[in-house]
Amino acid sequence: MSIKENSYFAGGVKSLGFNQQGQDVSVGVMLPGEYTFGTQAPERMSVVKGALIVKKAGEVDWVTYNTGEFFEVEGSSSFELQVKDATAYLCEYL
C-alpha cells in the first residue's frame, strides 16, 4: 500500500491518492481558479469543504456543489471547474 502525491495546474490542485478495499480514491485541495479535467473511468467527486462550480462535457449549464454534495462524471469524458475559494474534495474512481 502506498500514497501517491499529485500536483496539477502549477500547484493549484494537489491530491493524495490511495487504494481502499480495492477502490482507487484521492483526496485533495483546489485553490481558486478554473480547471478542466479529463476522466478515464467514471468518477464521483464529493465536496468536503467549500464549493465547486461544475460544467460537464456536452452540457451548457454550470452547477454549484457545496460542502456535503457530490456529482458524478462518465468515463472517457471531461468536466470544467470554477473554484472561488480553496476547496477540499474526495474523488472516488467508480
From Swiss-Prot:
Keywords: Glycosyltransferase, Transferase. GO terms for molecular function: guanosine phosphorylase activity; purine-nucleoside phosphorylase activity; thymidine phosphorylase activity; uridine phosphorylase activity. Pfam families: Ppnp. Gene3D superfamilies: Jelly Rolls. One of its GO terms (cellular component) is cytosol. Its EC number is 2.4.2.1, 2.4.2.2. SUPFAM superfamilies: RmlC-like cupins (SSF51182). InterPro entries: Ppnp, RmlC-like_jellyroll, RmlC_Cupin_sf. The keyword Transferase applies. It catalyses: a purine D-ribonucleoside + phosphate = a purine nucleobase + alpha-D-ribose 1-phosphate; adenosine + phosphate = alpha-D-ribose 1-phosphate + adenine; cytidine + phosphate = cytosine + alpha-D-ribose 1-phosphate; guanosine + phosphate = alpha-D-ribose 1-phosphate + guanine. It comes from the Bacteria. The keyword tRNA-binding does not apply. HAMAP family: Nucleos_phosphorylase_PpnP (MF_01537). Catalyzes the phosphorolysis of diverse nucleosides, yielding D-ribose 1-phosphate and the respective free bases. Can use uridine, adenosine, guanosine, cytidine, thymidine, inosine and xanthosine as substrates. Also catalyzes the reverse reactions. Belongs to the nucleoside phosphorylase PpnP family. This is Pyrimidine/purine nucleoside phosphorylase. It comes from Vibrio campbellii (strain ATCC BAA-1116).
